[in-house]
Amino acid sequence: MQPLTIETSSRLAPLAPSATRYTLTAQALHWLTVLLIVAILPVAWVMISLPTGPEQTRMLVFYRSLGVTIFAVVVVRLAWRLTHPAPPSPSGAPRVMELISQVTHGLLYALLLLMPVTGYLQSADGRPVSYLGLFNLPQLPKDKALGDVANVLHHLG
């Protein structure tokens, strides 16, 4: 009787980390970020369309919780990226394309960090930030001016 062997290298080759691909962890963090962004946008649209009341408050808690989760995932993603550099650009790519790619990535990361930060800074208006109703994030000192500026910046983003 011959031992059972299963050939997986050809099927899993596209998923295997290599010098020319992002690691599986980087790919998973990327797609988790995408999923969270896709989830938060309709939540925001529904939340702002609701009349003030308990239902809008529940949506706000969920919206803020998604924002906190996005922030945490992006921080983990950046830490991973710092310890696991991106694969090199395709050979022959024009230098200007590499520069555009790097600038675009930097701006996306900045936006992914600044949106949750400005959202959290809005709590300087005195409202606590609850994470899924499980616990509150540390309360910022009440500062109406900071809350107002954060509100404007968050809405511009």
Please identify what each model-predicted range represents.
Residues 1-157:
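Membrane-embedded alpha-helical bundles that constitute the cytochrome b-like, heme-associated redox core
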